[in-house]
Amino acid sequence: MSANTISTKVQSKDLNGLSLIAAHSHISGLGLDDNLQPKESGQGMVGQLKARKAAGVILKMIQAGKIAGRAVLVAGPPSTGKTAIAMGLSQNLGSEVPFTAIAGSEIFSLELSKTESLTQAFRKSIGIKIKEETEMIEGEVVEIQIDRSITGGHKQGKLTIKTTDMETIYELGNKMIEGLTKEKVLAGDVISIDKASGKITKLGKSFTRARDYDAMGPETKFVQCPEGELQKRKEVVHTVSLHEIDVINSRQQGFLALFSGDTGEIRSEVRDQINTKVAEWKEEGKAEIVPGVLFIDEVHMLDIECFSFINRALEDDFAPIVIMATNRGISKTRGTNYKSPHGLPMDLLDRSIIIHTAPYNADEIRTILLIRATEEEVELTGDALALLTKIGQETSLRYASNLISVSQQIALKRRSNSVDLPDIKRSYMLFLDSDRSVQYLEEFSTQFIDDSGNVTFGTNDASVKQTKGAANGEDKMETD
């Protein structure tokens, strides 16, 4: 008898993470050295040396924290790295300095007025460091005794905790027992307990218990047993924005509005009271004001009322540094009939310092495309990269970078791990750039519906033209 062989097939499926590849996910800073000199290529930034050096000076102003209420305009043609400079600036600032990024069209809403949307954006960009002294219990756990009731009542227990100088036994309530169980605290752990909130933080295991375990995970951390008194006073710094304080004090549901997003209109009286209180905290040394950055992309989409509000807001005591980006030349300011540089009123331009960006050359485009391919985990051959660089020069950098992921899918279809020249050519023929799309529209313009509603169906001898009647709104058909 022949034994039947049993074969098993194991399928594994990779889980997609939350960190998706975005347009500027490869940027980790401005690419400057300690002397604010820009590197040719660094931290994901390529070229634009003058603009990056100017942004580095702005970075030092922000980090000093003494200058606020300044306006910076980043102007340049499309696809020259204006938003990338702002993203690099935010990466260099870190999490301590508030950075708010909005688009010019975001402030137009049916629920909020334009000035309220701008005010909230300004207030989000101002941070407040509030200093608070709290009592902490810090020591090494010697023993935990938990008594569970047979009838299912409240648990009771005792916690023996020590430092190098003293040892104390604490009575535990139901809440503290649940906290210790949740943190999986055992004898030999060094813990910290906030007396005000009852929050338990596990700092690590004591060095004296290092030999009690034969095997330990990589996350296991050994620390020294604390010295001195068990109860200590520590200064804790909380960083919040002015907008968060506004929301908490303006609505009945308080901080829950921060999660729902339903902040609504906040009265000016509430903001005035908060400003007065924050000024008092600053004088008493309880709080420190951190001027942040408000980045407004496509700033030419704002109208004259918004620009007037920004002019006034920049003179306020609580004003961040406002960085604006635009790709417009001499164009109309929205809400007016006159033209101005970059679509901004002259009084706001006069208050701004302007950073210009220039188009990339071939070498810079090649380096940027190589960085994007590395970020998207796409392997490009030399010929494919050369063709992509040429496409980026003749069309736009965005179009060339978009072809990378498309070409990868075409390469995978022919079971290849690297993107070659035919893959780039095929994706170039499948997906049009803006210039070829305009040529297509001009060639078949009669077959598209125009502003008057006219369209021609068919070609050559037999064609039907449909027009919209101006007088009674009826459709009319004409046959050639």
Curated annotation (Swiss-Prot):
SUPFAM superfamilies registered for this protein in UniProt: P-loop containing nucleoside triphosphate hydrolases
Subunit architecture: May form heterododecamers with RVB1. Component of the SWR1 chromatin remodeling complex, the INO80 chromatin remodeling complex, and of the R2TP complex.
Keywords on record: Activator, ATP-binding, Chromatin regulator, DNA damage, DNA repair, Helicase, Hydrolase, Nucleotide-binding, Nucleus, rRNA processing, Transcription, Transcription regulation
Coiled coil stretches, renumbered: none
Protein name per its UniProtKB record: RuvB-like helicase 2
Chief location bin: nucleus
One Gene Ontology cellular component: Swr1 complex
Family membership: Belongs to the RuvB family.
InterPro entries referenced in this protein's UniProt entry, alphabetically: AAA+_ATPase, P-loop_NTPase, RuvB-like, RuvB-like_C, RuvBL1/2_DNA/RNA_bd_dom, TIP49_P-loop
Keyword Nucleotide-binding: yes
Pfam family for this entry, one: TIP49_C
Lineage: Eukaryota, Fungi, Dikarya, Ascomycota, Saccharomycotina
PANTHER family assigned to the protein according to its UniProt record, in alphabetical order: RUVB-RELATED REPTIN AND PONTIN (PTHR11093)
Subcellular location: Nucleus
Gene3D superfamilies noted in UniProt: 1.10.8.60, P-loop containing nucleotide triphosphate hydrolases, RuvB-like helicase, domain II
Catalytic activity line of the entry: ATP + H2O = ADP + phosphate + H(+)
SMART domains linked: AAA (SM00382)
Binding site for ATP: 76-83
EC numbers, comma separated: 3.6.4.12
GO biological process terms on file: box C/D snoRNP assembly; chromatin remodeling; DNA repair; regulation of transcription by RNA polymerase II; rRNA processing
Gene name of the record: RVB2
Organism from which the protein derives: Debaryomyces hansenii (strain ATCC 36239 / CBS 767 / BCRC 21394 / JCM 1990 / NBRC 0083 / IGC 2968)
Enzyme class: hydrolase
